[in-house]
Structures are given as C-alpha cells and as structure tokens.
C-alpha cells in the first residue's frame, strides 16, 4: 500500500472494544440499563433491567425475517413498562419510609399519554396494587372502564357533561373506585343528581389552582387564568 496507509489490523479494528462501543453510542446515558453491548459486540436488550433476562436485537430481527416479515419492523419490549412502574413505586416507597410518611402513594397513568392497548394493558397487569388510570374524555373513559380490574382506581378529569358523569358513576356500580375531579360547581350538581338516580355513592376530587402568580418558565401555571 501507499506510505502512511493504515491496515484494518493496525487502526480502528485493533482499537475497538466493548467499552468504546458503549462510549461511542452513549449507551449508558440513554439506555437506563435496558440496553447494553454484549461480549460479542451485539446490542442486547434487558427488558426487566440490569441482571434480568436479555435478548440480542439481532436475534429478534433474524426471527422476524424467518417468519416472513420485512424490515423495517417496530419492536416493542413491553416488560420495560412494568419494570419502570415498579421502579417508580419503589422510589416513592423508599422516600416515604425515609421521611416517616404514613400516607399512601398511587401511581396514576393518564391514558392520553399513550392510548395503545398494549401499553395500558401491560401497566394494568403490573400495577395490581397502588396503580390506577386517568381518563379525560368519554372515549378514554370507556377504554379505561374496560381495562381496569375490579377495585382499581379510575380518575375522571377533563370536560364532564352529564353522559360523562353518568358513565363514571356506572364504573362504581361495576366495582371500580372511580373519582370524579370537580372543576366547577355545575359538575358537582349534575354528578349528585346522577349518583342519586343510579343509587351509588360518588367519590369526588378537587382540582386546586394557585391564586398567586409566580415567576419563571412555568409562571402561567398559577393565577386566576391557570389551567
């Protein structure tokens, strides 16, 4: 070869390593322990976090092709959702124990964040205790009522007409722990009327708005015109 040319053996290939691969692709900074580089250089996914079962992404792609699928394909590792939920609940549990807080913590997932059935179903399956769903519209509420287990907490937010309120109260008759968040007096009046008609005891929550206006990026979250 020409003077000064580097062969693969004396340049990049010789210097490449697992640690360099992790650093080059900043894997520790974005993976949260769910993705790593294996000893053979392949990308590994650990859906239940470090130390849990792992699968090489290349093997997933090979299986997809074997089944006749063509790339690109969308691969979802839904076990990550359950692990993230458990991490969240453990974090609050630890903080409450450290500060001698004797209350309870319930993780509420607003279904509007991701309405995909697999996402909501996986969270419900992993959140038997201390977990609930939030609905902000009639279509969302119907989906939440169908997904939730008996006794589960359901938070009802957003615009609430008579039909929405009646649907939320029907949830109580189905054995769900539905909470209607009251934002204006008229909602309370209608909810009480519908509760009496259905013969159920309603549960209400109240949305509080800060009267004072702060300063900074989020200053508009307070004051009389805040959401």
Feature locations, PLM:
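Active-site-proximal beta-alpha core segment in soluble small-molecule metabolic enzymes
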Residues: 99-227
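A short linear-motif detector with a strong N-terminal bias
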Residues: 13-16, 22-24, 52-53, 86-87, ...
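Charged, compositionally biased N-terminal leader segments and the immediate start
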Residues: 8-43
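N-terminal amphipathic/basic-hydrophobic helices that include classical n-h-c signal peptides
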Residues: 1-8
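Low-complexity, highly charged intrinsically disordered N-terminal segments
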Residues: 32, 37-115
